[in-house]
């Protein structure tokens, strides 16, 4: 997820590491993958992930992406058709342009100043409280956000919005050509995620599961 690092999946890694071969990363500009020049596209980010998986000998991955990680997974499937064994979307949304209104697309391109204008303490609290329902989820996000300076955090948010707008505006196919499940927290309050997921499920004939007592993370 945007601004979150590999610690977002600590509990999932703990649950599945004895059964599955897992790889969790710090995306460019996140966690230990810093400093990083934030001028890349979503397609370039997918290419870097592909190179990492290839280097690790992982040739048919099941991609599990939360929020912006779900967008990245769709870009990966678009760029490397037939290579992905499965896709689990966690509180993400479709990259296909047809699902986003013109107003929403305009807002995506102009969201950065909203975050830059907020006091840093308020911004940190909003990042934690806005995405998590449980104390664990909120504290986990607080710890991940604490590693950034205000400028770093706002820079990540700005680049994330620009990157997504570029990928959506490219209006590529972004067809899900592998087994897929959509997961969405019943209490997700981030953007229009709760509205997009039923549309995505119906439009692409994908199964959607609502997760009880869960927010965005």
Segments (PLM) and residue ranges:
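Conserved acidic catalytic loop of the alpha/beta-hydrolase fold
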Residues: 43-61
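Gly/Ala-rich beta-loop-alpha elbow adjacent to hydrolase catalytic centers
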Residues: 65-69, 73
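Short beta-strand immediately N-terminal to the catalytic nucleophile in serine-hydrolase-like folds
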Residues: 45, 63-65, 90
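Flexible "cap/lid" loop of the alpha/beta hydrolase fold
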Residues: 74, 78, 85-118
């Amino acid at each position: 997820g945007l601004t979150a690092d590999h610690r977002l999946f600590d509990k999932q890694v703990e649950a599945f590491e004895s059964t599955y071969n897992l790889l969790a990363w710090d995306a460019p500009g996140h966690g230990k993958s810093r400093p990083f020049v934030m001028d890349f596209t979503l397609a370039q980010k997918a290419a870097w992930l592909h190179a990492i998986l290839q280097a690790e000998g992982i040739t048919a991955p099941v991609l599990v992406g939360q929020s912006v990680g779900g967008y990245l997974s769709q870009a990966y499937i678009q760029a490397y058709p037939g290579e992905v064994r499965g896709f689990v979307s966690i509180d993400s949304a479709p990259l296909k342009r047809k699902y986003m209104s013109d107003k929403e697309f305009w807002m995506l391109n102009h969201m950065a100043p909203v975050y830059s204008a907020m006091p840093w303490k308020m911004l940190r609290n909003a990042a934690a409280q806005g995405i998590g329902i449980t104390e664990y989820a909120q504290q986990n996000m607080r710890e991940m956000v604490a590693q950034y300076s205000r400028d770093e955090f706002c820079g990540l948010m700005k680049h994330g919005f620009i990157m997504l707008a570029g990928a959506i505006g490219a209006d590529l196919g972004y067809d899900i050509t592998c087994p897929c499940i959509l997961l969405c927290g019943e209490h997700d309050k981030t953007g229009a995620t709760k509205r997009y997921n039923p549309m995505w499920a119906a439009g692409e004939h994908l199964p959607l599961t609502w997760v009880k007592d869960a927010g965005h993370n």
